[in-house]
UniProtKB/Swiss-Prot annotation:
Specifically methylates the pseudouridine at position 1915 (m3Psi1915) in 23S rRNA. CDD domains: RlmH-like. This is Ribosomal RNA large subunit methyltransferase H. S-adenosyl-L-methionine binds at residues 73, 104, 123-128. The gene is rlmH. Belongs to the RNA methyltransferase RlmH family.
């Protein structure tokens, strides 16, 4: 199974790239974590935010391979504990499909992305900067994998 993190934004600070890559490299080959970056629309004083969000959504949906299980990262989503995420990860593996996790930009996800999602995951009730979300998602998925495989990374 492949995990795809599809996120709005391209030029991330080095600490974000290093943090994400640290967890990305820890995944086994049979559960690779891939990052697909979607260029953020230009935002300015007179920007049409609705149109920008729509275009970002179209690009995100176009990046999802046909048949993937889609998980949106959004506030109204399910707030999983680590064991619950580990259970979800196991179910995704048993389902036999790759998984695409969608992270929006500053205004969140386009309605089309929310509608296309099979599940919605809320990382926190806090507002998190979307660059940091990449690292939190990668670490959380790695921790869930470690729970499922009895790897010593996760300790109760």
């Amino acid at each position: 199974m492949k995990l795809q993190l599809i996120a709005v934004g391209t030029r991330m600070p080095d600490w974000v790239t290093r943090g994400f890559e640290e967890y990305q490299r820890r995944f086994p080959r049979d559960m690779a974590l891939e990052l697909i970056e979607i260029p953020a629309g230009k935002r300015g004083k007179n920007a049409d935010i609705v149109r920008i969000l729509q275009k970002e959504g179209e690009q995100m949906l176009a990046a999802i391979p046909k048949g993937n299980h889609i998980v949106s990262l959004d506030l109204p989503g399910k707030n999983w504990t680590t064991p619950e995420l580990a259970t979800a990860l196991s179910k995704w593996q048993l389902d036999g499909r790759d998984v695409s996790l969608l992270v929006g930009g500053p205004e969140g996800l386009a309605p089309a992305c929310k509608d296309a999602a099979h599940q919605s995951w809320c990382l926190s009730a806090l507002t998190l900067p979307h660059p940091l979300v990449r690292i939190v998602v990668a670490e959380s998925l790695y921790r869930a994998w470690s729970v499922n495989t009895n790897h010593p990374y996760h300790r109760e």
